Design a protein with these regions (language model features):
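Nucleotide-activated chemistry modules centered on ATP-dependent adenylation/adenylyltransferase
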Residues: 1-188
């Protein structure tokens, strides 16, 4: 099996890589995340996964299309539906395309690791793209190791632990409660 694994970030990769290696599967990571904003956050996450891959002796491929303009155009009419409309499909489709064009026979994604993502939708998209591109989809419910992976990423590997999913709107969501409290305190 020649596995290309879309990697959203280093912390989410830890458990996925460890569990696949325990099965005798050596993934190649694929970094394609044009939904991560602002740019300094994108760079921080990219550098972190680069260092993680070097530490773990993993092959990693970087597709550095930074897509703020496209992201804004695509999601402006439906900010609430951004994950379904843009964030998941654009990254997964590009991963399957790259796999097909570069001789990978199987794809998976670290998006299946997070307990905060739309797991069933991600799985459905991967199954759809698998049929469309003729590349197998390796499904694993990596969520079973969420806390184990989180602990290793943070405490053993000292990886950068981001505070929000990636896009500028998810960063706003991170502060929503604080914004509401500030409105009550200061008016507005």
């Amino acid at each position: 099996m020649k596995l290309l694994m879309h990697a959203c970030c280093a912390p989410c990769s830890v458990y996925c890589v460890d569990s696949l290696r325990a099965e005798g599967i050596e993934p190649t990571l694929y970094w394609y995340n044009p939904n991560i904003h602002p740019y300094m956050e994108y760079r921080e996450r990219r550098e972190c996964i680069k260092e993680y891959a070097e530490h773990e002796k993993l092959n990693i491929i970087f597709n550095d299309e930074y897509g703020l303009d496209n992201f804004c155009k695509e999601v402006s009419s439906n900010i609430e539906g951004r994950c379904v409309k843009y964030c998941y499909p654009v990254r997964l489709k590009k991963t399957f395309e790259y796999a097909k064009e570069n001789g990978y026979d199987t794809v998976s994604t670290t998006l299946l690791y997070s307990i905060y993502q739309k797991h069933d939708y991600i799985k459905m998209l991967c199954e759809q793209y698998s049929k469309e591109y003729g590349v197998d989809f390796l499904y694993r419910d990596f969520r079973v190791g969420f806390w184990e992976g989180h602990d290793k990423a943070k405490n053993e590997l000292n990886l950068y632990m981001q505070k929000y999913c990636g896009c500028i709107f998810s960063e706003e969501e991170r502060y929503k409660n604080k914004i509401e409290k500030d409105k009550l305190l200061y008016g507005g």
